[in-house]
Swiss-Prot record:
Basic residues composition-biased segments: 498-513
GO molecular function (one): serine-type endopeptidase activity
Gene: UL80
Protein name: Capsid scaffolding protein
Assigned keywords, A-Z: Coiled coil, Host cytoplasm, Host nucleus, Hydrolase, Phosphoprotein, Protease, Serine protease, Viral capsid assembly, Viral release from host cell
Enzyme Commission number, as recorded: 3.4.21.97
Pro residues composition bias: residue spans: 294-311
Motif (Nuclear localization signal 2): 537-543
Similarity comment: Belongs to the herpesviridae capsid scaffolding protein family.
Length: 708
């Protein structure tokens, strides 16, 4: 295509089609709602009885009245929504779009393979991918249907924008209106026929420059483009609209789903194109020899993307490959804009290569557009090779010494003693930066000055007195370990040994007594029950023989074992006391239930009847009188334990042979004898003890029986 054909195609009208509203998609804002009945009523009212427009609506950019680029050729309400077909005819606007499309990398990639490249159409598809309708609000149906008021026209204009606010308002551009309508599968054949009749009646002739309605400029379009950059949901909404409309099923110039990031990838140029461009752009300096062979490829970067070949610098030309190198090992040559890099080709080039003049041009100091990737070691090796040639190329340049400064000696792990010679900070600094050798001290000196000595007039302080230990008990007790000794400083040397031994002024013993009194409390007292001999007296519990400091070693283990034994004994004694208390309570209840008044002592519950009552029973036998004792014996056999003995059932003959007691006596030897016999029989019938706790329990019960 020639230049004239491209210019004529650029000024040719461009058609754009798309939905202005979708009836099946509810908008996010209520003011954007366009019901079907309201739209059809407006079309009949504005089309003078026909469902079309009698007057063409203006087509502008981003609702800017000064940026009118064409007109609406057809508008019709179809099954899925309100569809329109516009025509872009502004020559000034199309010329701006043509010039901008030549600088776009995304447009230069071209469309999908079956489509013909058209930069103007592709630029419009990527920049203004949405349609927006400016109309009256239809929040109220009655107000929307009535055209009375200041605004009698329901539709004002249609705008080409970056993204529409309504769903499904995607714009499709093309040179043929029939091709544009075929991109939408939702349009039926009848819909396309109606749209065709409208645009043929409206006309689509090109507008001349004198009647161009576009009164804006490129700066206004640039401002609108900057505003479109702040739309956060632009790309997701365009992808959604593209799928909703169904444009993805057919070829189009829509760039909604194409990411511009892929266009930023650096393309690798071929050797022929790069060689031609370098031969045309580069101008060799005077006296420089142009190599006949093609330059070697640059160093491969770490990324998989191949960088383009670097253009030759005016002052430095790439060197020829030596004939001894194999094809698998090409020569590596790179040109850099750093002043020291001018001598790199001279140092690394083969003998047959020549270098440009002595001073570089000013233009060679500018950074090139493309860069070359070098490893760190290769970069430093190039700098090292250029040091020798830098003073020659640049008079007055000072080259750094090749050898690095020696590392300082390591610091000592501990400070030197006071007997070592004193080393000042000046000597240390000289030792850092020069080959300083101390003749007196080969290693490092200390960092601090020695401690200042006292004035000769001051007396010498006495040496510190050593601490000694003293026993807290009498000299006769030798079994206490040294850990129990008390330590006294030398300040107590003026007091007498006797005063130390007996507590001095009494402060130490006083503190010990206060500590003991604070540690002893009512919680250490053991429990006592009514009826016991020691009831009402404070009895201390058994304390564990554990050291106050917790003990250590074997002492801690033995103390722990003793503590466990004492805990077991204490638990057994408490169980016995609870059993005895329960037995006393039950015996008290039984004695209260007997027919005769019984005198009870605090240590026994055996019922005794006087002799006068036994003889004056009126024919009653002692067995009958002892019926209460028999009941007690039965309950004792059932599990009721008495504190004094276990009662057994006595026969009538044994009670008769016991004989009456003296009158007025409150004792009953017959019952005591029977109780003792029953206790012996019960003890004989018991099983042997099971363990040590059971044996201790029986011994304790026997001791209590003897006391009673």
């Amino acid at each position: 295509m020639t230049m004239d054909e491209q210019q004529s195609q650029a000024v040719a009208p461009v058609y754009v089609g798309g939905f202005l509203a979708r009836y099946d998609q509810s908008p996010d804002e209520a003011e954007l709602l366009l019901p079907r009945d309201v739209v059809e009523h407006w079309l009949h009212a504005q089309g003078q009885g026909q469902p079309s427009l009698s007057v063409a609506l203006p087509l502008n950019i981003n609702h800017d009245d000064t940026a009118v680029v064409g007109h609406v050729a057809a508008m019709q309400s179809v099954r899925d929504g309100l569809f329109c077909l516009g025509c872009v005819t502004s020559p000034r606007f199309l010329e701006i779009v043509r010039r901008a499309s030549e600088k776009s990398e995304l447009v230069s990639r071209g469309p999908v393979s079956p489509l013909q490249p058209d930069k103007v159409v592709e630029f419009l598809s990527g920049s203004y991918a949405g349609l927006s309708l400016s109309s009256r609000r239809c929040d109220d149906v009655e107000a929307a249907t009535s055209l009375s008021g200041s605004e009698t026209t329901p539709f004002k204009h249609v705008a080409l924008c970056s993204v529409g606010r309504r769903r499904g308002t995607l714009a499709v551009y093309g040179r043929d209106p029939e091709w544009v309508t075929q991109r939408f599968p939702d349009l039926t054949a009848a819909d396309r026929d109606g749209l065709r009749a409208q645009w043929q009646r409206c006309g689509s002739t090109a507008v001349d420059a004198s009647g161009d309605p576009f009164r804006s400029d490129s700066y206004g379009l640039l401002g609108n483009s900057v505003d479109a950059l702040y739309i956060r949901e632009r790309l997701p909404k365009l992808r959604y609209d593209k799928q909703l409309v169904g444009v993805t099923e057919r070829e189009s110039y829509v760039k909604a789903s194409v990411s511009p990031e892929a266009a930023c990838v650096i393309k690798a140029a071929s050797a022929e194109r790069s060689g031609d461009s370098r031969s045309q752009a580069a101008t060799p300096a005077a006296g420089a020899r142009v190599p006949s062979s093609s330059p070697s490829p640059p160093v491969e970067p770490p990324s998989p993307v191949q960088p383009p070949a670097l253009p030759a610098s005016p002052s430095v030309l790439p060197a020829e490959s030596p004939p001894s190198l194999s094809p698998s090992e090409p020569a590596e040559a790179a040109s850099m804009s750093h002043p020291l890099s001018a001598a790199v080709p001279a140092a690394t080039a083969p003998p047959g290569a020549t270098v440009a003049g002595a001073s570089p041009a000013v233009s060679s100091l500018a950074w090139p557009h493309d860069g070359v990737y070098l490893p760190k070691d290769a970069f430093f090796s190039l700098l090292g090779a250029s040091r020798s040639a830098a003073p020659v190329m640049y008079p007055g340049a000072v080259a750094a010494p090749p050898s690095a400064s020696p590392a300082p000696l390591p610091l000592p792990s501990y400070p030197a003693s006071y007997g070592a010679p004193v080393v000042g900070y000046d000597q240390l600094a000289a030792r850092h930066f020069a080959d300083y050798v101390d003749p007196h001290y080969p290693g490092w000196g200390r960092r601090y000055e020695p401690a200042p000595s006292l004035h000769p007039s001051y007396p010498v302080p006495p040496p510190p007195s050593p601490a000694y230990y003293r026993r807290r008990d009498s000299p006769g007790g030798m079994d206490e370990p040294p850990s129990g000794w008390e330590r006294y400083d030398g300040g107590h040397r003026g007091q007498s040994q006797k005063q130390h031994r007996h507590g001095g002024s009494g402060g130490h013993n006083k503190r010990r007594k206060e500590t003991a009194a604070a540690s002893s409390s009512s919680s250490d007292e053991d429990l006592s029950f009514p009826g016991e001999a020691e009831h009402g007296r404070a009895r201390k519990r058994l304390k564990s023989h554990v050291n106050s400091d917790g003990g250590s070693g074997g002492h801690a283990g033995s103390n722990q074992q003793q503590q466990q034994r004492y805990d077991e004994l204490r638990d057994a004694i408490h169980e016995l006391k609870r059993d005895l208390f329960a037995a006393r309570q039950s015996s008290t209840l039984l004695s209260a239930a007997l027919p005769s008044a019984a005198s009870s002592s605090p240590t026994t519950t055996t019922v005794c009847t006087p002799t006068s009552e036994l003889t004056s029973g009126g024919g009653e036998t002692p067995t009958a009188l002892l019926s209460g004792g028999a009941k007690v014996a039965e309950r004792a056999q059932a599990g009721v334990v008495n504190a004094s003995c276990r009662l057994a059932t006595a026969s009538g003959s044994e009670a008769a042979t016991a004989g009456p007691s003296t009158a007025g006596s409150s004792s009953c030897p017959a019952s005591v004898v029977l109780a003792a016999a029953a206790a012996q029989a019960a003890a004989a019938s018991q099983s042997p003890p099971k363990d040590m706790v059971d044996l201790n329990r029986r011994i304790f019960v026997a001791a209590l029986n003897k006391l009673e």
